[in-house]
Amino acid sequence: LSLVVGKGVVEWIASRTGEFNCFGTDVGIGWAKHGKIVAGVAYANWNGVNVECHIASDGSRRWLTREYLTTIFDYPFNQIGIRPDGTRYGANRITVVVGEGNTDSNRFVKNLGFELESRLEAAHPTGDLLVYRMFRDRCRFLQVTHEQKLAA
């Protein structure tokens, strides 16, 4: 498996999730096998402290490696922002919004460590939208900071 970054990953995620937009200029990090994307994460609406995350896969679980999970959390929590001096910084939290009827995705984000924050009643074609959050200091996939990696 290999990492893939770019607009193609974002478009693949949009096609898998049925999202009504193409996520604009957002960043996507994918996991590919034999040149075909099997999983991806798109990061949207970064505002300096929070970023939204959209996750999709081909339905398999072979992509769920520690390496990939560390990468998809390291980027938003340690690298997404760039200060005027060129140093990178990350989000304090990630937000994920899932349709209530998507039981697999709801179970998946909970297993990753996201916490249910709120419910948007009748906000999705399948019913309610469930809003999940994860704070940087609660992410179990961040074993070392980005700065520690650079110093090593």
Give, region by region, the residue ranges found by the protein language model.
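Conserved beta-strand in the GNAT
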Residues: G35-N45
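Conserved acetyl-CoA binding element of GNAT-fold acetyltransferases
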Residues: G48-S60
